[in-house]
Amino acid sequence: MTEAPTWEVDLFVDGPITLNRRYRTTQQKGFRPENPFYSDVEMAGIPSGGLRATVTARAPNERLAFDAAVVFFGRMLDALAFEVDLPLFLSLTEEGPRNSRVRHHSRQIIGHQLIKNAFRAADDLGMTEPAFLRSLGWYRKGLYTEDPLDKFLAFWNAIEIVAAGYYRTVESIDQEQAKKGSKNQIWGCFIALWGECERWPNIPGDDRWIAENYETRTKIAHGISPVDIETVTSVMNRLDVIQRVAHRFLWDWREEILHAGWDPASQSAPNSDDEALPF
């Protein structure tokens, strides 16, 4: 059988970040040790903010090559966006999510170790904790989307996916109660992670927070609430808190339950070759 050709795919990341030097790495893509494919990735900062990346992908046609590169690079971006907690939008064109590119006057300089760690985290989570990696994808969407309703749903989904995917694995959670639905699953996970409601970070003592936000989620997702100024304002008033709760929940779940936190001194992932380019 003829081997699929290898393509180069150009991708652009819009966001308040940059690299101080070009960066190149080779990463194993996919989880087939009997037939591994190594993807070359080269990245550079964009003066107005963001990154330009060229990713190699093996696929029978251009469309599938682009899709494969987006999934592969996007998972790394999910891990990176969560770590730096900044909106990072991935696209095929340099214009980004809006008609004209917005210049980011302040840009966090991303070190090469952060990029290495993000690739490694995406690879490890993809193999061992795919539900958690999917929740990071929703969290990144919550960071970059400009629609307040979509932003709320994305942050809620990030919480809900972890609760639904892992409550059965935590012995201290009341399994019979959790089976009644996502509100109970989230409640059980919060208790297991942080203790009683009075100790919950960002929402201490607010025992109505889960129920009220679940109701908001249901009204948005099912089109029950009219999309008027009152609804939008109400949702916007919830965004700051739900973002902080989602980030803290995912962070603590990763560290305390999954024990999958980043080691700042960790080396690059196995089967990778990294190089900082001098220009």
Regions found by a protein language model. Give the residues of each.
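Terminal, compositionally biased low-complexity regions
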Residues: 1-113, 171-204, 252-279
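Amphipathic, oligomerization/interface secondary-structure segments
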Residues: 118-279
